[in-house]
């Protein structure tokens, strides 16, 4: 029985990974459409509006175009690196996003399957729950720098190599500020576990300082009210990590040469594009999780929502599923807002020069992140006296 349950859990976790990856890939065309319509709205034009209602079928036309383009490889390219780079571009985003809790767990009661009794079972609405979720996500996301170098070196083109070196230097530079910006959050909540961080942000704002409990019922208990500087630094560094404007020095979409993926076209280019949106999704998901309560509803604790659902649903399993559905919708509303901010900023701010980009990362954001970490540690120590 124990072996069967282990196989069952491995199968369920494998299926969840596949489903989350498919959700990410399927979300990309919708985000592309939203970006096109959003940029048109910002620039006072129409955007895609000819193919289908509101231009929605344009997504299918683009997919067919990418799949039917000629597959070629430059003579000077290194075949393994050239073909492996777009594949590996998808992996960090999908694997890292799978570790983010998208909703509260669903409690499944006992049930019969394959002639055996199974359960009770706690179904996590995430690919996998590991105790050091933050470290895992940052570690996997950082592998994207290798993808850039693989594409630049494997293309056998000096311009793609220079673009890859610039892009990887940018990514590595801002990873320092990105990592330090959330050290304050880790110290504040005292855990690396993402679910525990989410649950720590339930209800209205309340904290203890020098033996006194301070409450503000008109504010949600979100991390941004404890770490406003960390939130600003994290979100700014996330733009640089995902190579989005105003930090798109890796490619420069308005220029003739596309940086590290100059020699890629068709579906191979599209895979890099999906990878970029994957990093945007990770950044938006982590922003929601660290600083905006994750899947929790503002002012409402999980226990209060469970109590309400128990009075509405006929069984405990249905009540748990209802709570998970509500939390999933809440997470996606917050998540969608930050995805829109990525689009909004791209079509609003101009691009930095490369020297400005490096100065901002090393001379401004890194010192501020260090100062925020030191001050947070000092305040937590004083509050504990």
From Swiss-Prot:
<dbReference type="InterPro" id="IPR018086">
    <property type="entry name" value="NADH_UbQ_OxRdtase_su1_CS"/>
</dbReference>
<feature type="transmembrane region" description="Helical">
    <location>
        <begin position="14"/>
        <end position="34"/>
    </location>
</feature>
<feature type="transmembrane region" description="Helical">
    <location>
        <begin position="280"/>
        <end position="300"/>
    </location>
</feature>
<feature type="transmembrane region" description="Helical">
    <location>
        <begin position="325"/>
        <end position="345"/>
    </location>
</feature>
<dbReference type="GO" id="GO:0003954">
    <property type="term" value="F:NADH dehydrogenase activity"/>
</dbReference>
<keyword id="KW-0520">NAD</keyword>
<feature type="transmembrane region" description="Helical">
    <location>
        <begin position="130"/>
        <end position="150"/>
    </location>
</feature>
<keyword id="KW-1003">Cell membrane</keyword>
<keyword id="KW-1278">Translocase</keyword>
<dbReference type="GO" id="GO:0016655">
    <property type="term" value="F:oxidoreductase activity, acting on NAD(P)H, quinone or similar compound as acceptor"/>
</dbReference>
<dbReference type="GO" id="GO:0005886">
    <property type="term" value="C:plasma membrane"/>
</dbReference>
<keyword id="KW-0812">Transmembrane</keyword>
<dbReference type="GO" id="GO:0048038">
    <property type="term" value="F:quinone binding"/>
</dbReference>
<keyword id="KW-0874">Quinone</keyword>
<keyword id="KW-0472">Membrane</keyword>
<keyword id="KW-0830">Ubiquinone</keyword>
<comment type="similarity">
    <text>Belongs to the complex I subunit 1 family.</text>
</comment>
<comment type="subunit">
    <text>NDH-1 is composed of 14 different subunits. Subunits NuoA, H, J, K, L, M, N constitute the membrane sector of the complex.</text>
</comment>
<comment type="function">
    <text>NDH-1 shuttles electrons from NADH, via FMN and iron-sulfur (Fe-S) centers, to quinones in the respiratory chain. The immediate electron acceptor for the enzyme in this species is believed to be ubiquinone. Couples the redox reaction to proton translocation (for every two electrons transferred, four hydrogen ions are translocated across the cytoplasmic membrane), and thus conserves the redox energy in a proton gradient. This subunit may bind ubiquinone.</text>
</comment>
<feature type="transmembrane region" description="Helical">
    <location>
        <begin position="80"/>
        <end position="100"/>
    </location>
</feature>
<protein>
    <recommendedName>
        <fullName>NADH-quinone oxidoreductase subunit H</fullName>
        <ecNumber>7.1.1.-</ecNumber>
    </recommendedName>
</protein>
<feature type="transmembrane region" description="Helical">
    <location>
        <begin position="172"/>
        <end position="192"/>
    </location>
</feature>
<keyword id="KW-0997">Cell inner membrane</keyword>
<dbReference type="InterPro" id="IPR001694">
    <property type="entry name" value="NADH_UbQ_OxRdtase_su1/FPO"/>
</dbReference>
<dbReference type="Pfam" id="PF00146">
    <property type="entry name" value="NADHdh"/>
</dbReference>
<dbReference type="GO" id="GO:0009060">
    <property type="term" value="P:aerobic respiration"/>
</dbReference>
<keyword id="KW-1133">Transmembrane helix</keyword>
<feature type="transmembrane region" description="Helical">
    <location>
        <begin position="219"/>
        <end position="239"/>
    </location>
</feature>
<feature type="transmembrane region" description="Helical">
    <location>
        <begin position="365"/>
        <end position="385"/>
    </location>
</feature>
